[in-house]
């Protein structure tokens, strides 16, 4: 008798926790009568040397929810998960091969739960299982922004929903709305229980025990923006020092720095020197733990970052005050304009207090858990400017917002050239010379000159 096989593709522990919470909440139906496969993908630049998901505390309990676990890297070896997709004429062969290898009957129905549907490996899976329904889960602030790339209609029409965390209550995701896909919240209590489960699994970690003993009152989050070519290594090093100094000014004397797993050791050394100069205690945690585990174990009074999703999990699920440092600089630097990090940066810049400003952590400014009325229109306007072709229906609202709200306090969310190319308010007149140059370029391109 044919059965339903659900394939859950994950690449991070945070994403796996999101799926586990959705499963626990019954959002994928009952386990009876279906088979669940956890498909693990390591998307690191060099997977062979990177930390494996199975090595992280808490992974085992999450994996126990599934009937079997498959390593995607091994399945497509020697190809890289981020760079490989099947040729159109080979998709049927790949599906037959994977059904055989993974014990899926030829008549069994398959559903896919994937992250980042715009890129591989999610796109590759969607192409191989071309008749399968798709469930997209988003585990961060990017879900509030537009889809990164235009998806084939054959993929978009199969997407049933976008599962996401309620990181900013009241703010609706733009992701995949061009296909009329509805967003569905993963319940807060289910996600928090999974985070507690992961934290409990890390209880025997000696580094975590040592960190908890230091009783840090502020956590500094590193993101390694230099590897994305947004900041230089020196600039990011200085950004971390600014975080530390801001926390010290706010009265914190015991601080914890959680660097990005791939960040160079020099970042930690620079912070250690700054902590020594400031006369405060700094602990560096370089063990592979979720930031949320630190919130569970250490109960800090402040979390500082640039635009990390972990800032908002601190606020939304633990009620910890958060503060930003360097967000405006990164917002100005990221290119192209449609870079999907722009929406997380916009949200953080609009909502989160700046640690380097006086009275940044005043009581009336610290609650970022609920979206103010000003945030939704701003996000939709930025989203339209990022992907105007995907969301033409947003143009009237974007025009109205720019006419009414664009000034010195909001100009940093937009680029003049982008507004000009879309003939939106704030872009200025498109001069005859500009139009002529573009016409000449198009003509030369058409004629092959």
Name each model feature, range by range.
Residues 13-16, 43-47, 117-121, 141-142, ...:
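Short acidic, S/G/P-rich loop/turn micro-motifs used as interaction or catalytic elements
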């Amino acid at each position: 008798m044919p059965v339903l096989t659900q394939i859950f593709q994950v690449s991070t522990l945070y994403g796996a926790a999101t799926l586990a919470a959705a499963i626990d909440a019954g959002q994928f139906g009952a386990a009876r009568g279906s088979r669940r496969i956890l498909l693990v993908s390591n998307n690191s630049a060099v997977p062979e040397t990177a930390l494996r998901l199975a090595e992280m505390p808490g992974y085992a309990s999450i994996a126990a929810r599934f009937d079997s676990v498959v390593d995607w890297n091994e399945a497509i070896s020697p190809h890289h998960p981020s760079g490989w997709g099947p040729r159109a004429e080979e998709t049927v062969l790949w599906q037959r091969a994977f059904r055989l290898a993974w014990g899926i009957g030829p008549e069994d129905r398959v559903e896919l739960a994937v992250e980042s549907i715009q890129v591989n490996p999610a796109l590759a899976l969607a192409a191989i299982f071309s008749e399968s329904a798709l469930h997209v889960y988003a585990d961060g602030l990017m879900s509030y922004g537009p889809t990164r790339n235009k998806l084939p209609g054959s993929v978009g029409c199969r997407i049933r929903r976008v599962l996401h965390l309620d990181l900013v209550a009241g703010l609706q995701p733009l992701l995949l709305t061009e296909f009329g896909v509805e967003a569905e919240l993963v319940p807060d209590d289910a996600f928090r229980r999974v985070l507690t489960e992961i934290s409990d699994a890390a209880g025997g970690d000696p580094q975590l025990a040592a960190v908890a003993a230091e009783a840090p009152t502020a956590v500094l989050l590193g993101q390694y923006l230099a590897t994305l070519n947004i900041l230089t290594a020196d600039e990011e090093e200085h950004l971390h020092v600014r975080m530390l100094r801001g926390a010290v000014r706010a009265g914190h004397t015991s601080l914890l720095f959680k660097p990005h797993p791939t960040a160079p050791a020099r970042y930690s050394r620079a912070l250690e020197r700054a902590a020594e100069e400031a006369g405060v205690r700094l602990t560096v945690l370089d063990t592979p733990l979720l930031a949320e585990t630190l919130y569970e174990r250490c109960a800090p009074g402040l979390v500082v970052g640039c635009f990390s999703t972990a800032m908002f999990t601190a606020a939304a699920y633990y009620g910890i005050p958060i503060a930003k440092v360097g967000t405006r600089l990164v917002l100005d630097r990221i290119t192209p304009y449609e870079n999907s990090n722009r929406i997380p940066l916009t949200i953080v810049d609009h909502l989160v207090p700046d640690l380097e400003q006086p009275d940044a952590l005043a009581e009336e400014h610290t609650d970022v858990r609920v979206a103010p009325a000003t945030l939704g229109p701003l996000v939709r306007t930025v989203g339209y400017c990022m992907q105007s072709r995907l969301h033409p229906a947003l143009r009237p609202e974007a025009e109205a917002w720019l006419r009414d709200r664009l000034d010195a306090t909001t100009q940093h969310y937009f680029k003049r050239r982008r507004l000009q190319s879309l003939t939106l308010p704030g872009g200025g007149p498109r001069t005859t010379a500009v139009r002529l140059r573009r016409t000449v370029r198009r003509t030369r391109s058409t004629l092959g000159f």
